Amino acid sequence: MLYYLLQYINDVFDPPGFGVVEYITFRASAAAITSLLITIFVGPRLIAYLKRKYIEPIKEEAPPEHRKKKELPTMGGTLIIFSILVSGLLWSRFNDPYVWLILLAILWMGTIGFIDDYRKVVLKIKGGLAARYKLIGQVSLGLVVGLYTWYDPAFSVLQSQTTVPFFKNLTINYGIFYIPLVVFIITAVSNAVNLTDGLDGLASGVSGIVVFALGGFAYLTGNTVYADYLNINYISGAGEVAILSMAIAMSCVGFLWFNSHPAEIIMGDTGSLALGSAIAVIALLIKQELLLPVLAGTFLLETLSVSLQVAWFKFTRWRFGEGRRIFLMAPLHHHFQLKGWAEEKIVIRFWIITLLFFLTSLMTLKLR
């Protein structure tokens, strides 16, 4: 909205300096600042409200150190979603379908997460929303995104081919596997972020780094000069994804204002599922989905720790008559908690690991 207002003022009155509104970098910075300020200033009011009604109990199976923490208000993801929506709509172009697809994903999975949180903290239903209904929501979103991008001519480049990290001239044409791939990535990434959301500031910090990186890739993808130089797919309109990505990244940073240890609020499934779906859809739209195992490596490690733990436990119970574990507890961050690591140290180290994954993903632009 502000974009169109400033554009109108520039076209009609031509005041000096207003032409910067046409620059992606300016609007991305403005969206980032707007999102950060909204989160910081709205946060205290939302926390005060949620404390009265939406307190999530500590899980019985949590590590001993985790059970010592006071019960916190959940559904903090509503703050993240609100700041993204406002800043995104203020600074993005409404005629760009990329923007609407990302916002749809955030609202879609945010709603499913909200229902899950509501059932847990208000209706006192242990486990919240049944896993099968979450899966139905994730698969449905994947089908909507996949089918829309497959049949809409504006997205014709999306399903045709994608570049492969570390290989200069290697491309993949997904063909009929494109839609199943979209469903898988959206489901996998949203679940991965949800699994990672277990310590103060962990999921929000890691998500912020990953989305910031994707915003940089989106900017390069939407610029013909950079895309040609770096030998990546040029996608017209991907620059708008960079703007929304900066809004998402800074909403995570703003949320850390209240979610860093000791947390005043947690994002709940409302936030983790919304952020996970946003990461997945952004990567798919800018054709960097094959880079996700590197860029989002922290989420991958957390997910693998759970998968390996469950698989090994079932195998050893079948083979030896008793279940055995690889980790003290899964996901991985709880393993380190039980090893005696301080919560703050675990979170900071996971952030550092995520930054290393980020830098490695940048290297793939030239290591081909």
From Swiss-Prot:
Function: Catalyzes the initial step of the lipid cycle reactions in the biosynthesis of the cell wall peptidoglycan: transfers peptidoglycan precursor phospho-MurNAc-pentapeptide from UDP-MurNAc-pentapeptide onto the lipid carrier undecaprenyl phosphate, yielding undecaprenyl-pyrophosphoryl-MurNAc-pentapeptide, known as lipid I.
Protein's recorded name: Phospho-N-acetylmuramoyl-pentapeptide-transferase
Organism (species): Prosthecochloris aestuarii (strain DSM 271 / SK 413)
A Pfam match: Glycos_transf_4
Entry keyword set: Cell cycle, Cell division, Cell inner membrane, Cell membrane, Cell shape, Cell wall biogenesis/degradation, Magnesium, Membrane, Metal-binding, Peptidoglycan synthesis, Transferase, Transmembrane, Transmembrane helix
Location(s) in or outside the cell: Cell inner membrane
Catalytic activity of the protein: UDP-N-acetyl-alpha-D-muramoyl-L-alanyl-gamma-D-glutamyl-meso-2,6-diaminopimeloyl-D-alanyl-D-alanine + di-trans,octa-cis-undecaprenyl phosphate = di-trans,octa-cis-undecaprenyl diphospho-N-acetyl-alpha-D-muramoyl-L-alanyl-D-glutamyl-meso-2,6-diaminopimeloyl-D-alanyl-D-alanine + UMP
Top-level division of the source organism's lineage: Bacteria
Mode of membrane association: Multi-pass membrane protein
CC per GO annotation: plasma membrane
Membrane-spanning parts: 30-50, 72-92, 98-118, 135-155, 170-190, 201-221, 238-258, 265-285, 290-310, 345-365
EC number: 2.7.8.13
Molecular function as annotated in GO: metal ion binding; phospho-N-acetylmuramoyl-pentapeptide-transferase activity; UDP-N-acetylmuramoyl-L-alanyl-D-glutamyl-meso-2,6-diaminopimelyl-D-alanyl-D-alanine:undecaprenyl-phosphate transferase activity
PROSITE patterns found in the cross-reference section: MRAY_2
Cofactor: Mg(2+)
Pathway: Cell wall biogenesis; peptidoglycan biosynthesis
Family label: Belongs to the glycosyltransferase 4 family. MraY subfamily.
PANTHER family: PHOSPHO-N-ACETYLMURAMOYL-PENTAPEPTIDE-TRANSFERASE, PHOSPHO-N-ACETYLMURAMOYL-PENTAPEPTIDE-TRANSFERASE HOMOLOG
GO biological process: cell division; cell wall organization; peptidoglycan biosynthetic process; regulation of cell shape
